[in-house]
């Protein structure tokens, strides 16, 4: 895959996250959030490193408030790992790709890779 998908509806979240057959990173963010802009290139690195083994999506909490509330997102960026439709790990704040990998346990979740950052 290697690209980041914008989620703009509950149906898209259901399809691209909850029904995904591969692990999914969900970046809960907002356009006005400075740290969210800082973490964006780090997520691009992860998308490139993991390719087809991992999906990365962005959920704008201003557009998708119901999803953010459902998952108890109180700070952004919140970066969550979903596996088989379940939230299994999360990290909060702007972090380097390698730290995000460690916080989310990505190597064990995908059986793969490591970001080059």
Language-model segment annotations:
Residues 54, 59-68:
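Structural microenvironment flanking redox-active thiols in thiol-disulfide oxidoreductases
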């Amino acid at each position: 895959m290697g690209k980041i998908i914008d989620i703009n509806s509950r149906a898209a979240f259901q399809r691209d996250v909850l029904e995904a057959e591969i692990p999914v990173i969900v970046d809960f963010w907002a356009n006005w959030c400075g740290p969210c802009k800082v973490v964006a290139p780090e997520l691009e690195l992860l998308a490139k490193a993991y390719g087809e083994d991992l999906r990365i999506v962005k959920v704008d909490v201003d557009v998708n408030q119901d999803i953010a509330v459902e998952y108890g997102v109180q700070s952004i960026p919140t970066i969550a790992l979903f596996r088989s439709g379940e939230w299994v790990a999360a990290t909060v704040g702007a972090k380097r790709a390698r730290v995000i990998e460690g916080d989310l346990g990505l190597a064990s979740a995908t059986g793969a890779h490591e970001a080059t950052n």
